[in-house]
């Protein structure tokens, strides 16, 4: 799926992230049983080093992710998720394509992320490679991955 006028990704300001948080609550808190206090953090309230992105299709919210810029030239992507009923339709791939182009445009040389182990094949298909051993985050197995731009 390519992003078009009906399918797009937009930056959400910190004071208007309720749509992003709704998707994350459904996926991470309700579906994966991540405690609210671990899922919602300072990056969701007032952190200027973080941008939230909303994935939409014909005006319907379908997914979200966020980027953290706390290291020069490196963007750290977190919280990529899509509503369960909207999975398998290419929104994740569209988000990753957008993410890579946006980070290149901003002068980033690398993107890092902490991937849940079940999602590693997806990220590998988007050009990411594992660079760590397995670690637990919110009780879920993850590995650090990166993509050199």
Feature roles, as predicted:
Residues 2-52, 56-58:
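Short amphipathic alpha-helix that is part of the acyltransferase structural core
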Residues 54, 60-68, 76-81:
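Conserved beta-strand in the GNAT
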């Amino acid at each position: 799926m390519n992003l078009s006028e009906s399918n797009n990704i937009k930056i959400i300001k910190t004071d208007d992230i309720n749509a992003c948080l709704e998707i994350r609550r459904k996926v991470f808190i309700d579906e994966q049983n991540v405690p609210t206090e671990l899922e919602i953090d300072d990056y969701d309230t007032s952190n200027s080093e973080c941008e939230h992105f909303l994935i939409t299709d014909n005006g319907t919210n379908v997914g979200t992710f966020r980027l953290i810029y706390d290291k020069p030239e490196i963007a750290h992507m977190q919280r990529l998720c899509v509503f369960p009923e909207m999975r398998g339709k290419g929104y994740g791939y569209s988000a990753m394509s957008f993410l890579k182009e946006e980070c290149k445009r901003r002068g980033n040389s690398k993107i890092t992320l902490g991937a849940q182990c079940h999602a590693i094949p997806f990220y590998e298909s988007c050009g990411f490679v594992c660079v760590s051993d397995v670690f637990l985050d919110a009780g879920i197995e993850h590995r650090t991955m990166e993509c050199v731009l």
